[in-house]
From Swiss-Prot:
Residues 447-478 are annotated as: Disordered. Keywords: Cell outer membrane, Cell wall biogenesis/degradation, Lyase, Membrane, Signal. The active site is at 302. HAMAP family: MltF (MF_02016). This is Membrane-bound lytic murein transglycosylase F. Coiled coil: none annotated. Residues 23-257 are annotated as: Non-LT domain. It catalyses: Exolytic cleavage of the (1->4)-beta-glycosidic linkage between N-acetylmuramic acid (MurNAc) and N-acetylglucosamine (GlcNAc) residues in peptidoglycan, from either the reducing or the non-reducing ends of the peptidoglycan chains, with concomitant formation of a 1,6-anhydrobond in the MurNAc residue. Its main location: membrane. In the N-terminal section; belongs to the bacterial solute-binding protein 3 family. One of its GO terms (cellular component) is cell outer membrane. The lineage of its organism: Bacteria, Pseudomonadati, Pseudomonadota, Gammaproteobacteria, Alteromonadales. The keyword Transferase does not apply.
Amino acid sequence: MTRFLFAIILGLLLTACQQETVEETEFVPHKLTELRVGTLYGPQIYMTSGQGNSGFDYDMAVLFAEYLDVPLKMVPYTNLAELYDALKKNEIDIIAAGMTETPARREHFRLGPPLYRVNQVLVYREGMPAPKDISDLKGKITVIADSSFVETLTQLQKRHPTLVWDQVTDKDNEELLTMIANKEIDYTIADSSSVQINRRYLPVLRSGLVLEEKLNVVWLLPPTHSDGLMSQLLAFWHQEKLAGTLDHLNEKYFGHVKRFDYIDTRAFLRAIETVLPRYRQHFETHAGDLDWRKLAATSYQESHWNPNARSPTGVRGMMMLTQPTAKEIGITNRLDAEESIRGGAAYLRDMINRLPESIPESQRMWFALASYNIGYAHVEDARKLAESMELNPNAWQDLKKVLPLLQKRKYYQKTRYGYARGSEAVHYVDSIRRYYDTLVWVDNQSKQQNSEEVAPSDLTAEETPVPAPGTLSPDKPK
C-alpha cells in the first residue's frame, strides 16, 4: 500500500511539473501484463551469451520488472530510428539503451532518472596526432545517425562552419570503434564508458577531446499517457538508489575498466592466441561450476600462463600455489600445468564456499579472489572495518575502498590479523576482471565466426523473452 501511494504522489507531482510538454490526462496507475523494453546490443547495455544475459540496462530492467511483478521482454533493435519508431507505435513501453539526456530527447520523450554519467569523447587510433581542438582534425568524423553525437556536432558546427561528418544507419557504436582500430575511418564520437570497455579488446583506441561532460544516462518513455509508468519508475529508482543497487551496477560494469595498460592489453591478446590453446582444455576440465574463463584470467594474472613461474616468496606454477596450500589440496607437482590448474580451481572454490552467505552470488568471486591474493583472514578484517565505517561489508564496491586501509597503521592496528597490502588485492581483482571480460569477448567472437546462425545485424526487432520475475536476478551468476 505504501509503494502504491508513493507511486500516485510521484505521478501527480510529475504531471504538474511537465504540463508544458505532456498532455493533461487523469492519472491512472499504470497496469502492465509484461514490461516490453526496447534496447540495442552493447556490452554495457544488453548482451546475450551461453553464460546468460548481461548489461547495466538489462540488469536494471530485470529488477524493474520484478518491482512491477510482471514478466520482462527485451526487444533489441538494429538502429535508433527503429527504436524510436517502436516507442511511438506503442510496440514497446520503454527504451533502455544506454542513452544520454539531450535537449532533443527532452523535447520528444519523457526521461527517466539518471542511472550513471558519461562524457562524450572524440575517438581516434593510436599513432594519429591528438587533436587539441575540433578545428585540428585531419580527417572525417563518422557517427551513428539519430544519435546524441549528431546533436553535439550540429552545435559545434555553429562555431566551426567547416566541420562535416558522415552518418551511418547500418553500424552500431562497437562497429565504429572497430573501424577506428582497423583504420577504416578516422574519427568517431563515443561515450567514455563505451571507450573504456572496448579498449580492452581494441587497445589502439584513444580518447581525445571531451566534447560534452557529465551527461546523464537515462531511459526514455513516451511523451504522453505515461504518467503511471513514470511514477513507478521513479519509485523503483528511489528504492534501488537507497539499496545501493546503482552503485553496485556501476562498479560491476565500469569499476574495473578505468585503469588501462596498453602494453599489457596487447600482450594478453597475443597470449590468448598463442599460449592459451595449450592449456584451455585443462581450464575447462577443472573449472567445474566456475566459469573456466575466470579461472584462466586468474592464472594469467598469477603467472602469465607460465607453468614454470616462481616468485621470491616461494609460490610456483600456473596458479602460483604455496607449498602448504599445494599439500593441503593434494597437489604433488606445482610445476605440472594441469595439476596446478586443478589445485588452483579447488583452492578458489574453497575460498568462495568459506564466504558468508550474506555476500551476493554476483560478487562472491571478487571477494574470493581478494582472499586468494592476501588471505581470507585479511578480507574478513576488511569486512569488519567496513562495517565499523558504516559501509556495506557484503558489497565489493565498498570493500574496494576499505582494503587499502589495511596498509595504514591507524586502521590495521584495530584489526585481528594486522597489516596487509590491500591496495594490491584491489588491483589484482580489477586486473582479473579485465582479463576475464577480454576472454569473454574473444570467446564470443570466435563462436560467432564459427556459427551458421543469422547474424544480429540481419534481424529486425528480434523479441527475446526473459524468465518471469524471481527466476533471474543480477545477483545470480551470468
